[in-house]
UniProtKB/Swiss-Prot annotation:
Gene3D superfamilies: 3.40.50.360
SUPFAM superfamilies in UniProt: Flavoproteins
Any Pfam family: Flavodoxin_2
UniProt gene name: kefF
Protein's recorded name: Glutathione-regulated potassium-efflux system ancillary protein KefF
Length: 176
């Protein structure tokens, strides 16, 4: 099962993430948990989140890039849900062997994230990648949808279909 942990503080403003979710929903075996819809008060149901994670084979952290990082509720979710003794540390093997895909949207162009004036995605992904490895997750190459503020509908739809294809390819490779 693919579990998408969706963290967008303003989902009604996002054309890119909306299209990505619409494409993902067309696949079988996909569950979407919209953190800002489930927890507008930031009071996370840790047991429910851990139960959802336990059913997943592939976990996707999907969100817009915010100041080269993740939205605050996703950070809190990671801090609370990926707890010692469950996700890491003594006895913390609940996520071992599962896969993690970072699916991120950006307002800037791809060249904005190349080495130079701004850090590249290899650098930006390091905290998430380190978290994944620490919890025994297999880190997959990230999916990034760039230029979401200026893309036309056709481009956004094409990139969303590419996202669906990434998920489908993972399903086929791991579940035949």
């Amino acid at each position: 099962m693919i579990l998408i942990i969706y963290a967008h503080p303003y989902p009604h403003h996002s054309h890119a993430n909306k299209r990505m979710l619409e494409q993902a929903r067309t696949l079988e075996g996909v569950e979407i948990r919209s953190l800002y819809q489930l927890y507008p008060d930031f009071n996370i149901d840790i047991a429910a989140e851990q139960e959802a994670l336990s059913r997943a084979d592939l976990i996707v952290w999907q969100h817009p890039m915010q100041w080269y990082s993740i939205p605050p509720l996703l950070k809190l979710w990671i801090d609370k849900v990926l707890s010692h003794g469950w996700a890491y540390g003594h006895g913390g093997k609940a996520l071992h062997g599962k896969y993690l895909l970072w699916a991120v949207t950006t307002g800037g162009g791809e060249s904005h994230f190349e080495i130079g004036a701004h850090p590249g995605f290899d650098v930006l992904s390091q905290p998430l990648q380190a978290t994944a490895i620490y919890c025994g997750l297999n880190w997959l190459p990230p999916f990034a949808m760039h230029c979401t503020f200026i893309c036309d509908d056709e481009t956004l739809e094409g990139q969303a279909r590419h996202y669906k294809q990434r998920l489908l390819e993972w399903q086929e490779a791991h579940h035949g």
